[in-house]
Amino acid sequence: MVQCKKASIMPQTVASLKPLSIHATGAVDAQVFGARGARLARLAALGLDVPQALVYPPKLVDAIADGAEITWPRALGGQVLALRAAPQEAEWGGPESLLPIGVAADTLDHFIATRGEVEALRLQLQCIRNLGAAVSGATRNSIAPPPQSGDSAADLRHQIQTAREAYQAETEDAFPDTATGQLRAALRHMARGWHSASARILRAAKGAPEDAGLAIIAQVLVPNCRTGRLQFVDQSSGQAQLVGYVLQDGKEHPLSELSARECAALKALEAPLTRGHADACRVKFALDATGKPWLTDVRPAQRSARATLRIAVDLAKSELISREDALLRIEPRSLAEHLHHQIDPDETRDVVTTAMPASPGAATGRIVLSAQAAMAAEAQGEAAILVRHETSPEDIRGMHSSVGVLTIRGGMTSHAAVIARGLGLPCVVGAAELRLDMKARSFRGPKGRIFSEGDIITIDGTSGEVINGTCKMIAPDLGGPFTVLMSWADKVRSIGVRANADTPTDARAARSFNVDGIGLCRTEHMFFEPERITVMREMILADDAASRAEVLQRLLPMQRADFIDLFDIMRGLPVTIRLLDPPLHEFLPHEPDELEHLARVMNVGIDDVRARAAELAEVNPMLGMRGVRLGITMPEIYDMQARAIFQAAVAINAQGGAPVVPEIMIPLVSANREVELVKERVDAIAAAVQAETGSSFAYKLGVMVETPRAALRAKDLAKSSAFLSFGTNDLTQMTYGLSRDDAGRFMRDYVQRGVFAEDPFHTLDLEGVGELLVMAARRGRDTNPDLVLGLCGEHGGDPAAVRFCRLAGFDYVSCSPFRVPIARLAAAQASILAERGAALK
């Protein structure tokens, strides 16, 4: 059990402890006034109307809990009070408010004279009912039923007497019959409640220290008032609007029912509150009999991510905060809500299961279980959710045709997650509670719920929820405040942000997000168009180098056309092209009809196709014949790609304008000799193209650092490389010895049990993988001071990784197009905090 040590108060010091007025001048310490007391003091300092109030500081509250005597504060004489808890941090909680306090036998005549007999008696009954229930532990209704609007004075006197008797029966003590006695009982109850065992445990769970203190506010209740809540901006959009309600007869009534004068008085509060707090506010208020508003609390206005952005931009435009402060107020990841459809927060969700949110946004569509079915649905104009055990490169065309992707297996950097983020598709992965039955064309969810192909579901890639049926959506919002904020971010950031873009379509999306270039173009994704995949498969299944080279000549114009488009779209910006990386078996068909089609095209038997595919099979393909190993053992593949790149550069440069300087990246390198072998052939191809075309062009050759050995030997690699770009997906995988596709099965348990602070595929591991990055950066630049450093894994869109890369001296990060705004904002925040000398976390 958590123990809470309460400070001992010496008897001689108790008398010196006094309640403090919120209207006192000077600095207000939240440690003394509590969070709520400090807020009230600030309202008073702004010259706003706040009911008179005193704060009992924590040391005095502790003394009262120990039995210290108190008197009714002279400053609050003749008033009815409300007692409210004011811990130093609002989230720590505290005892419930107690009100009304102070209507007793010794004050009743005063209140009858000032408020009328019925109102005074009603207050006295409420006091006995509420305070009596709190002190005795009984329910309010067991002390007395609530007073009714038609009760006469005689009715109320009878109910008061009955309530006194009920209280005495519960406690064996008489109810306090003086205002001071009521105040003492209320304060003591709240103080002792704060130090109870259950309260200590709850506070500790919320991060409160053992010696956390409680202040208590005694505030005058505005007589004959209606209370309410109000904020000055719409919670969803952030646009200026009076939003709230007023309580009357125990019911919430819209502000529109108030008089025009009352609404104007409330509206007039907006300017001083916003100016005084440099933020949009929400308040609790009391309207007195004349319609004058009195403020009883203030908090930051409730707001969605979209509203947060608009509010920050509006405050900066009004010069209430700086542009830099506006940038710092936005959580970078929250920008995803601007970029994608989101489920309306008021929508009721029939959640089937919750898995890993791999790509933000939400989508509704019919279940399809294959890429072909997704393409067929698109052709018919139907929205489809592609559901697979896991995706592979041959599913990419189906993903393009879908509005969302759901996989049973996989993690944050699985194939489905990476491609979906690049396409801006909502994606949920690792839905292990679902049982996919391809024969039955359905999947079974928890509690035996069965969903068949063609049924409608919704996936929320922001929360990871899979939902039955349709959901109302909120559309993306990339205009106005979003554009303004991004322009401010670009003016202050000092690290480049590029995009991972594999096709011209991806490049156009990236360009729309104002990227600084393409940091990773995965050329293998260009081969999965229907008219190309068969040619690619012919090349893979060729028996010898000559046959392979012949087929590659048919692929050359296809690659060249894509590179021409990429260079044209990104004209004036760098484009980093990764040579073929995945193992060849990923391009081969698995479905019987596709195998038969390939056999017909190649004019061979289907058994021959199966046999050749079997020859290419590997026990651990991700660590086998892939990347640079393909380029060295089958050099004609990289030769074709290099030629296509250089011919495309010549074609674009012939049009005039900024010259294209291709950046060619070699994947999965572990030794500098690998780089030297590829470089020799690439340089030879460049010379040949220059001779053939009579054109000169510049290009850069670099390495994708994905293996721990490459990071450790960066000093060697820098001798032959113009740049090093760190592929942190595979680097994390190899550093940890984790499969990114299978880690989702246990990652949640590992994070919950504290093995990992975060999923290392989601947030960059700064201690392990980060140390490799820093080491490689330092060693590489020791050899080559002009070495360009980049990060092109999915971590490029992780705000913590962006800040880390800036500190480590990297030149750029690269991420999926729809994560570019997140990286741009994170980069700006890193620059601002560094300039201000703040510690980056």
Residue ranges and their predicted role:
Residues 26-30, 359-401, 769-785:
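C-terminal accessory/binding modules appended to enzymatic or scaffolding proteins
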Residues 203-210, 327-376, 383-384, 453, ...:
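Long, charged amphipathic helices and adjacent flexible linkers at domain junctions
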Residues 57, 391-394, 412-414, 433-445, ...:
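Short acidic loop-to-helix transition motifs that present clustered carboxylates
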Residues 478-481, 488-841:
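Conserved alpha/beta-domain cores
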Residues 403-409, 427, 790:
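A short, small-residue-rich loop immediately preceding and capping a beta-strand
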Residues 54, 408-410, 429-432, 521, ...:
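Short beta->alpha connector loops at strand-helix junctions that form conserved
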Residues 2-346, 376-378, 382-385, 392-397, ...:
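Nucleotide/phosphate-binding sheet-loop regions of phosphoryl- and nucleotidyl-transfer enzymes
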Residues 288, 426-428:
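Hydrophobic alpha-helical bundles that form the membrane domains of multi-pass transporters
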